[in-house]
Amino acid sequence: MDLKKQYIIALDEGTSSCRSIVFDHNLNQIAIAQNEFNTFFPNSGWVEQDPLEIWSAQLATMQSAKNKAQIKSHEVIAVGITNQRETIVLWNKENGLPVYNAIVWQDQRTAALCQKFNEDKLIQTKVKQKTGLPINPYFSATKIAWILKNVPLAKKLMEQKKLLFGTIDSWLIWKLTNGKMHVTDVSNASRTLLFDIVKMEWSKELCDLFEVPVSILPKVLSSNAYFGDIETNHWSSNAKGIVPIRAVLGDQQAALFGQLCTEPGMVKNTYGTGCFVLMNIGDKPTLSKHNLLTTVAWQLENHPPVYALEGSVFVAGAAIKWLRDALKIIYSEKESDFYAELAKENEQNLVFVPAFSGLGAPWWDASARGIILGIEASTKREHIVKASLESIAFQTNDLLNAMASDLGYKITSIKADGGIVKSNYLMQFQADIADVIVSIPKNKETTAVGVCFLAGLACGFWKDIHQLEKLTTLDKKFKSTMDPNIRKTKINSWHKAVERALKWKEID
């Protein structure tokens, strides 16, 4: 085959928008198309989206990207799909219509149900051992249970054996294949609270616990399996050639693969509104003693699964947005580096803990609230901006230390991606405070690149990881220049501030 005239399209379905990106054999980005879709908040803590709007938006970007690239469908060698995780859709398999809106991963409507389950420590332990996850509204199981209990049409279709469940990847695959394939991959299945990550299969015991019938669940495949062919009517009326779906990964796992964190101990951090830190831990699902998640990273066909430890920072870029929108002390996020550098001229020991809605791992305190300590009469806006950027690095450092403690070795480097890696001040401070090398790739679309790589390996577009390494180039690298004693002092100040932020709501 003439590789110069072959392409891979990555479908990247995110939480607020979806994109399609066309890549060539040299990983050049030939074309990109993006569409946003609506999010609804019908009640406090409820977050929903329209599955049909997601589908039409994603399909439109796929068609648009192909047309922008001026390529034919028969020149597309494969498609890969990456998606927002945990979000659920239930639909009628006879007409393809959803029975309810998609319940999004941030949705908290099942918090009381999760709390009830968590009161039983035996159940809590069993679920963690099987899934690597805590019982939390974030994950899919209790969302499914809510629809089955509260939507009469769902109950009726379930009794008639006409109901199907899927995370967003399953929903898109089912639509792209015109209902021929009801499947998911191991990375998405591992986020449902229904998948045994040791046995690598749906757990009948967990399905019974959460009252979810196994019959509505998709078949679980390896991450670079054959997920079916995209029907020609989704390209154009005169489309020729069969285009297979050859890779599926949850978005954070896709970023891990896109950063080529393919060896145990390799770490990536996606710096966005929040942060997602994932570490490849190899083929054994080590359970964290520091409340990190253990999840399936990916599984290649005829290979054992690869697992990851995952930790989240709730507020990262959101802290900078808060400075702009709420405090109005900066006009754009781009100004943050300028002010942070300005603050270095009059250094202060100012610490900001942005616990707007609690703190995640390793603290796990929903009652924690934001706090700024060390304010003096000479404190100016630049000191608060600097402390805000530094808070992102401090929180990431806490996660890296938790991962290192779980696995018994020091982390020496991380690969960074996401919107706020543009901040040179943040990246340098991250290297300094964690004493790591921070590497940033030239191609910032690491999520899409991850499924592109996986699809390309599956269909022979690329031979192996070594070939992929030659396609990835570094944009920037940051190394620590901080004195170890200064680092220790700064971390101690951070932890003192965190201690004061914990259990704040209980003071009322």
Swiss-Prot record:
Binding of ADP occurs at T15, R19, T273, G317, G419
Q: Please name the CDD domains in this protein's record.
A: FGGY_EcGK_like (cd07786)
Pathway listed: Polyol metabolism; glycerol degradation via glycerol kinase pathway; sn-glycerol 3-phosphate from glycerol: step 1/1
Q: How is its activity regulated?
A: Inhibited by fructose 1,6-bisphosphate (FBP).
Supply one GO BP term.
glycerol metabolic process
User: MF terms per GO, please?
Assistant: ATP binding; glycerol kinase activity
Gene Ontology terms: cellular component = cytosol
Carries keyword tRNA processing?
A: no
Keywords of this entry: ATP-binding, Glycerol metabolism, Kinase, Nucleotide-binding, Transferase
**Residues holding ATP:** T15, S16, S17, T273, G317, G419
User: Which superkingdom?
Assistant: Bacteria
Would the keyword Kinase be found if you checked this record's keyword annotation?
yes
Q: Where does glycerol bind?
A: R85, E86, Y138, D251, Q252
Q: What is its EC number?
A: 2.7.1.30
Q: What Gene3D superfamilies does UniProt report for this protein, alphabetically?
A: 3.30.420.40
This enzyme catalyses: glycerol + ATP = sn-glycerol 3-phosphate + ADP + H(+)
* SUPFAM superfamilies referenced in this protein's UniProt entry, alphabetically: Actin-like ATPase domain
Q: Where does sn-glycerol 3-phosphate bind?
A: T15, R85, E86, Y138, D251
What functional role does this protein have? Key enzyme in the regulation of glycerol uptake and metabolism. Catalyzes the phosphorylation of glycerol to yield sn-glycerol 3-phosphate.
Family listed: Belongs to the FGGY kinase family.
PANTHER family for this protein: GLYCEROL KINASE, SUGAR KINASE
Q: What is this protein called?
A: Glycerol kinase
